[in-house]
C-alpha cells in the first residue's frame, strides 16, 4: 500500500504519513552518532567518524563538527552533501544578519530560518527532503548557552542533552538517566564520551574515530569561543575517562 504514496513528498498516505520524510530519517539512522550536552559553562558536541584512514588528512577534513559563526556551531548526522548545502545557507544567513544589525544572530533565529528551508523541501513537488539532522550549539545574550536538534521534516526543539544518528534511541535513554542540571563542561565531556562508548557500533574506541567540539565563553574577555579537540587531547580525555583502547593494527 505504501508504494502508492511514497514516490512524492507532497502526497500524504491514508494514515497521514509522508513516507519520503520518514525515509530521510532512516538515512540518518545509518550515519555516525552525534551527541550534544548542555553544561552550565558551555555546550559539548561529540561525534563518531565513519571514515578513518591513515591516508586521510585529518587537519583538513571534518566529518561531524562545523562552525557556522563565531558563536554557533553544529554536529551533523546524515548525508554530508546535503549538510554542506544547509551549512552554507546557515553561514550566509548569519553573515547577512550581522551586516544588517551589527551583532551576531540569535541562535534560535538562525535555527528556525534553516529549518524553514528544510521544511520547504517537504512541501513542494520535484524536491526531496534533506537527509540530515543537526545538533546546534551556541550562545547569545538573550538565552545564554543553547542546544537545539533538528530533523529532515524541518522540526526543531531545544534540549539539555540530545543524540542523533545510529543508536540514537539507546544514547538518548542513557543521557536521560545520567544527565543532571548544572554540569560543568568537563563533566559534560565525560558524560558524552561514556554514552558514545556504549552505543557506538565500533568495538574499539580511539581518538581517530571521534570528533569533539566545545562552545564556551573565554574567561576574562567573555568572548564566545569554538574549540575543536585535537586527536592528542582526545586521547588524553579517553584515558582520563578510562575508555581508551588500543587502536587495531593497520
Curated annotation (Swiss-Prot):
Q: Is the Cytoplasm keyword given for this protein?
A: yes
Q: Which GO terms describe its biological process?
A: ubiquitin-dependent protein catabolic process
| Tree of life domain | Eukaryota
What family does the entry list?
Belongs to the peptidase T1A family.
Role of this protein? The proteasome is a multicatalytic proteinase complex which is characterized by its ability to cleave peptides with Arg, Phe, Tyr, Leu, and Glu adjacent to the leaving group at neutral or slightly basic pH. The proteasome has an ATP-dependent proteolytic activity.
Q: Which NCBIfam families match?
A: PRK03996.1
Give the UniProt keywords, A-Z: Cytoplasm, Nucleus, Proteasome
The protein's matches in Pfam families, at most eight in alphabetical order, are given as: Proteasome, Proteasome_A_N
Asked if the keyword Nucleus belongs to this entry, the reply reads yes
InterPro entries from the UniProt entry: Ntn_hydrolases_N (IPR029055), Proteasome_alpha (IPR050115), Proteasome_alpha-type (IPR023332), Proteasome_asu_N (IPR000426), Proteasome_sua/b (IPR001353)
Enumerate the SUPFAM superfamilies for this protein. N-terminal nucleophile aminohydrolases (Ntn hydrolases) (SSF56235)
Query: What are its GO cellular component terms?
Result: cytoplasm; nucleus; proteasome core complex, alpha-subunit complex
What's this protein's name?
Proteasome subunit alpha type-4-2
Question: Where is this chain's protein located in or outside the cell?
Answer: Cytoplasm; Nucleus
Q: Assembly and interactions?
A: The 26S proteasome consists of a 20S proteasome core and two 19S regulatory subunits. The 20S proteasome core is composed of 28 subunits that are arranged in four stacked rings, resulting in a barrel-shaped structure. The two end rings are each formed by seven alpha subunits, and the two central rings are each formed by seven beta subunits. The catalytic chamber with the active sites is on the inside of the barrel.
Triggers of expression? Up-regulated in the leaf sheaths of rice plants grown from seeds that were inoculated with the nonpathogenic P.fluorescens strain KH-1.
Amino acid at each position: 500500500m505504501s508504494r502508492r504514496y511514497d514516490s512524492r513528498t507532497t502526497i500524504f498516505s491514508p494514515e497521514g504519513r509522508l513516507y519520503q520524510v520518514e525515509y530521510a530519517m532512516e538515512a540518518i539512522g545509518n550515519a555516525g552518532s552525534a551527541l550534544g550536552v548542555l553544561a552550565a559553562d558551555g555546550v559539548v558536541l561529540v561525534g563518531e567518524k565513519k571514515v578513518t584512514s591513515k591516508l586521510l588528512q585529518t587537519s583538513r577534513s571534518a566529518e561531524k563538527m562545523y562552525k557556522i559563526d563565531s558563536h554557533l556551531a553544529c554536529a551533523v548526522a546524515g548525508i554530508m552533501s546535503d549538510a554542506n548545502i544547509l551549512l552554507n545557507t546557515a553561514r550566509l544567513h548569519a553573515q547577512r544578519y550581522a551586516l544588517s544589525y551589527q551583532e551576531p544572530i540569535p541562535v534560535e533565529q538562525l535555527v528556525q530560518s534553516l529549518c524553514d528551508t528544510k521544511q520547504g523541501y517537504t512541501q513542494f513537488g520535484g524536491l526531496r527532503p534533506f537527509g540530515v539532522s543537526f545538533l546546534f550549539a551556541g550562545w547569545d545574550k538573550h538565552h545564554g548557552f543553547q542546544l537545539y536538534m533538528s530533523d529532515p521534516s524541518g522540526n526543531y526543539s531545544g534540549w539539555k542533552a540530545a543524540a542523533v544518528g545510529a543508536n540514537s534511541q539507546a544514547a538518548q535513554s542513557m543521557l536521560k538517566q545520567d544527565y543532571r542540571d548544572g554540569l560543568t563542561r568537563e563533566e559534560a565531556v565525560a558524560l558524552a564520551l561514556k554514552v558514545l562508548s556504549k552505543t557506538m557500533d565500533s568495538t574499539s574506541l580511539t581518538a581517530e574515530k571521534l570528533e569533539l567540539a566545545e562552545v564556551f565563553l573565554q574567561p576574562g574577555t567573555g568572548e564566545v569561543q569554538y574549540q575543536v579537540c585535537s586527536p592528542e587531547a582526545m586521547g588524553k580525555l579517553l584515558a582520563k575517562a578510562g575508555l581508551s583502547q588500543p587502536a587495531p593494527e593497520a
